[in-house]
A protein has these predicted regions:
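Secretory targeting and sorting signals
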Residues: 2-39
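C-terminal region of N-terminal signal peptides and the immediate post-cleavage residues
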Residues: 30-54
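N-terminal module-boundary/linker segments of secreted carbohydrate-active enzymes
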Residues: 50-53, 58-117
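Acidic (Asp/Glu)-rich catalytic clusters
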Residues: 89-92, 124-137, 172-177, 200-208, ...
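Hydrophobic faces of well-ordered beta-strands that scaffold small-molecule active sites
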Residues: 95-101, 140-144, 182-186, 207-213, ...
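N-terminal carbohydrate-binding/catalytic regions of secreted carbohydrate-active enzymes
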Residues: 99-172
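Distinct, well-ordered alpha-helical segments
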Residues: 192-204, 268-274
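Surface-exposed substrate-engagement region within the catalytic domains
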Residues: 228-343
Length: 344
């Protein structure tokens, strides 16, 4: 209502705002419907049936790709660990040249005559001296005495002193960083080889670590070190082989070396019964005799004659006990050429 010039009120209709609002709303909805993308075929049916339409996430919980983002990365598989020098099978793709001994104890071998960096440098130089004589790459190696035969029974009465994993870990880790292989040597006394091997499971889970059994220092009940040459039955070796093969397989490691030291035939009883059926394990017979070249050659002939066909062989040179110690050329002249050569 408005007021006229005469002062009288004149009836002029006001706008009907409810009707205007309804009209505008209807117009907006019609425009939105005209611009909308039609749903894909089957979407309406899916909606009425309760099944997920093409734009719904599957019931399996698969990730939904949001526009403007990348698809989830596919899971990647870590590369299989390899041996020092490459590959996952030991021989015939390499030759090992090793320093033998115990860290910090010079009396037990040349490995203990210098500190860790010095031992790496010495092993590397020694391996290099064989490179011109070898038809395969030469890998510097540590053969570390992990358990040492003792003249005293010790707290557990087994006449064997066991190194801790923590004390050996730096030698293993730094050897790996230098591209070296490591063999843990067991001198069990009255203990059994398998029980001692299990002590070093954490180290044997590493791809550059193998194992050596030294029957010379395996004692029967009532025996003491140095009173006789010890020995072990093939069945006891087979128990270690089976356990180590299982560990290697379950942790997807490359083939592991299992060294058997020998300089008398009696050191490995029933040698023909050695279990060679585990592809995860490469056995190697290591001739450990010392003395004159003629005496060592005689021992070599006896050991090689009794070794199961096809097993690789090793040779040990002694700086003090050999008279004289063979040169690399003389060492490699043996047939078959040794695939592991240790220095003590």
């Amino acid at each position: 209502m408005t007021e006229s010039r005469s002062g009288r009120t004149v009836g002029v209709p006001r706008p009907v705002w409810g009707a205007v609002t309804a009209t505008l709303t209807a117009t907006v909805l019609l425009l939105a419907a005209a611009c909308a993308t039609p749903p894909p075929p089957g979407a309406a049916a899916a909606a009425t049936s309760g099944e997920p339409g093409p734009s719904s996430s599957p019931s399996t919980g698969a990730p939904r790709i949001v526009p403007g983002t990348s698809a989830p990365a596919a899971p990647t598989t870590a590369p299989a660990p390899e041996l020092p020098g490459g590959g996952r099978v030991l021989f015939p793709g390499r030759r090992l040249v090793a320093l033998y001994g115990h860290p910090g104890t010079a009396a037990l071998g040349v490995l203990g005559e210098q500190d860790l960096p010095g031992s790496i440098a010495r092993a590397t130089k020694l391996a290099a001296s064989y490179a011109p004589l070898s038809d395969v790459p030469v890998v510097p190696t540590f053969e570390i005495i992990a358990t040492t035969a003792s003249s005293e029974p010790g707290g557990d009465g087994d006449y064997s002193s066991e190194s801790t994993v923590a004390s050996l870990r730096p030698w293993v880790d730094q050897a790996a960083a230098a591209g070296m292989y490591v063999v843990l040597d067991l001198q069990p006394g009255r203990a059994d080889f398998l029980s001692q091997a299990r002590r070093y499971t954490d180290l044997l889970r590493l791809p550059n670590v193998g194992l050596a059994l030294d029957p010379e220092w395996h004692l029967d009940p009532g025996q003491k070190p140095l009173a006789q040459i010890g020995g072990v039955d093939a069945a006891d070796i087979n128990a270690v082989t089976a356990w180590l093969a299982g560990l290697t397989a379950t942790t997807h490691l490359p083939q592991k070396l299992l060294v058997l030291h020998q300089f008398q035939l009696s050191m490995i009883r029933h040698e023909h019964n050695l279990d060679l059926s585990h592809p995860e394990i490469q056995l190697l017979i290591h001739m450990d005799g010392n003395g004159t070249p003629a005496l060592k050659d005689e021992t070599w002939a006896a050991v090689t004659a009794s070794t199961p066909p096809g097993l690789p062989l090793g040779w040990k040179n002694f700086y003090d006990e050999d008279t004289p110690m063979l040169t690399p050329t003389q060492t490699m002249a043996h047939q078959p050429a040794p695939l592991m050569i240790s220095y003590q």
